[in-house]
Amino acid sequence: MEKAKFVIKLILQLALIMLITFIGTEVQKLLHIPLAGSIVGLMLFFLLLQFKIVPESWINVGADFLLKTMVFFFIPSVVGIMDVASNITMNYILFFIVIIIGTCLVALSSGYIAEKMLEKSNTRKGTDHS
């Protein structure tokens, strides 16, 4: 019986996550926002969580499940790369340069944004020690 309750809770929470993503996609289409609908849904989801409209307890089991199974979502990307492996082997140096530059840009921009958000949070709390 416990297992059945867990599975039902998981399905309902995943459905809620998918619903918010779907709403984000529809908002993006309606307002012609130049972002992917899933990103709009992610921002909407973030706001719903921040303002406690959607409590964390409503999605914790579903979110944990998605985090634990995230690796499987990248398998199609790897399979797609295998389709163009011959092109990559011909230009492998350029391919790796692009990967290294892209990784560095993502790491640098993520770090910069995280620092700015932390500074803003500390300033708001009055604990700016920089």
UniProtKB/Swiss-Prot annotation:
Transmembrane segments: 6-26, 31-51, 65-85, 93-113
Protein known as: Holin-like protein CidA
Pfam families in the cross-refs: LrgA (PF03788)
Localisation per UniProt entry: Cell membrane
GO CC annotation: plasma membrane
Function: Increases the activity of extracellular murein hydrolases possibly by mediating their export via hole formation. Inhibited by the antiholin-like proteins LrgAB. In an unstressed cell, the LrgAB products probably inhibit the function of the CidAB proteins. When a cell is stressed by the addition of antibiotics or by other factors in the environment, the CidAB proteins possibly oligomerize within the bacterial cell membrane, creating lesions that disrupt the proton motive force, which in turn results in loss of cell viability.
Membrane topology: Multi-pass membrane protein
Disulfide feature: none
Stretches of the chain forming a coiled coil according to its record: none
GO biological process: cytolysis; killing of cells of another organism; programmed cell death
Entry annotated with the keyword Metal-binding: no
Alphabetical keyword list: Cell membrane, Cytolysis, Membrane, Transmembrane, Transmembrane helix
Highest taxon listed in the record's lineage: Bacteria
Family: Belongs to the CidA/LrgA family. CidA subfamily.
